[in-house]
A protein has these predicted regions:
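Short, electropositive alpha-helical surface patch
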Residues: 125-134, 163-174
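Positively charged, low-complexity, intrinsically disordered RNA-binding extensions
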Residues: 150, 159-164
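Conserved, mostly hydrophobic/aromatic
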Residues: 18, 113, 152
């Protein structure tokens, strides 16, 4: 989980969100014996993939020892799309090749990138569909070049006042 999400979870139980507490939580989670029963892969964040456990090995090593495959979220978030202020473009391509090489060395074997689309009568626009598809394609090519598997997530948000048929039509466009 991201540092922000982890902070919310820890603060909800009155635990300070320090790097040490986040590490202890993750280490406990990833070393649970039941993890091997149903978790085939774990998507990590930059902080997590670089953390060293209290037993002096990195979190990806712990995940691998438990029989799962470590992966990494590599996009840097969705920002407002130029010329379409109501839509988003996912960023993170700058410097991605170097980050992917580092993540592979740290144990990642797959990656995740999310493109977000909102549904309205006008959206997603052709511009948003094309821009995010282009970014997803570039991301995928770089990941494969670095010997990892890309997870491509074009996420069409279902929020809003539209019918299921409109949602299906917009999702099909994407």
């Amino acid at each position: 989980e991201s540092t922000g999400t982890m902070t919310k979870r820890l603060e909800a139980v009155k635990v300070p969100s320090t790097p040490e507490n986040r590490l202890l939580f993750r280490e406990t989670l990833f070393s649970a014996s039941s993890m091997t029963e149903c978790i085939g892969g774990v998507i990590l964040y930059d902080e997590t993939i670089k953390q060293e456990s209290t037993k002096k090995y990195r979190i990806p090593e712990l995940i691998s020892k438990m029989g799962s495959t470590p992966g990494i979220k590599v996009d840097t978030g969705a920002k407002i799309l130029a010329k379409s202020p109501d839509e988003k473009i996912t960023e993170g391509l700058d410097g991605l090749r170097d980050r992917l090489k580092e993540y592979y060395q740290l144990g990642a074997r797959f990656t995740k990138w999310r493109g977000v689309y909102n549904i309205t009568k006008e959206h997603p626009s052709k511009l948003a569909i094309h821009s995010n598809a282009h970014a997803l394609a570039r991301y995928s090519a770089l990941v494969q070049e670095c010997n990892m598997v890309p997870i491509v997530e074009p996420e069409v948000l279902m929020d809003g006042n539209h019918s299921a048929q409109d949602c299906l039509a917009k999702t099909s466009e994407v």
